[in-house]
């Protein structure tokens, strides 16, 4: 659980996997405490990601800002991000909770996110999170030289 916690809560950990496939992330601020702020830039780098961003009318790089709401080391991380990158939509907050549980032979993560302003953006958010979690699994697999069961 310590390793998964580190990947969720450190600059180096997040930069290894955060963001959908085809994106890189650069963390510029990470104050891991309740009320602490974080900020990162996520950039589309693969041809497919670049095309998807352009077709959605979005910048290739978006800066995300948020704050930590709750921190229970190695168990629970709650945070709020500001969705301020959507053309024609006023900024609003989106809450998320990550729960980390011991499981037979490993760790079980439960990630819960608020819905976004409409079904399309909620679906995009879910797809992005699922892709990010796939990348997290690959990081863990590479570290342990094994393949894990699908989520």
Predicted regions and their residues:
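Surface loops and adjacent helix of pleckstrin homology
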Residues: 19, 43, 82, 112, ...
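Hydrophobic pocket/interface hotspot
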Residues: 4, 14, 38-40, 68, ...
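Glycine-rich portal/gate segments that line the openings of hydrophobic small-molecule binding cavities
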Residues: 26-82
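A short, structured loop/turn motif at beta-sheet edges
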Residues: 1-2, 30-35, 69-76, 99-108, ...
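Short solvent-exposed loop/turn micro-motifs enriched in small/polar/acidic residues
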Residues: 22-24, 61, 91-93
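Short, highly charged C-terminal tails/helix-capping segments
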Residues: 138-151
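Beta-strand/loop substructures that line and gate deep hydrophobic ligand-binding cavities in soluble
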Residues: 69-70, 78-130
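Hydrophobic ligand-binding cavity/cleft-lining segments
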Residues: 1-25, 29
């Amino acid at each position: 659980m310590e390793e998964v916690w580190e990947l969720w809560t450190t600059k180096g950990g997040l930069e290894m996997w955060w963001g959908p496939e085809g994106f890189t992330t650069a963390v510029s601020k990470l104050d891991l405490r309740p009320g602490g702020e974080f900020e990162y830039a996520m950039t589309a780098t693969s041809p497919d990601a670049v095309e998807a961003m352009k077709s959605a009318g979005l910048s290739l790089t978006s800066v995300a800002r948020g704050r930590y709401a709750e921190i229970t080391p190695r168990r629970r991380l709650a945070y709020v991000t500001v969705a301020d990158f959507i053309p024609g939509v006023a900024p609003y907050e989106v809450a998320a909770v990550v729960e980390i549980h011991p499981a037979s032979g490993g760790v079980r993560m439960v990630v819960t996110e608020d819905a976004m302003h409409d079904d399309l953006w909620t679906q995009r958010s879910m797809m992005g999170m699922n892709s990010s979690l796939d990348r997290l699994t690959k990081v863990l697999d590479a570290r342990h030289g094994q393949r894990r069961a699908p989520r």
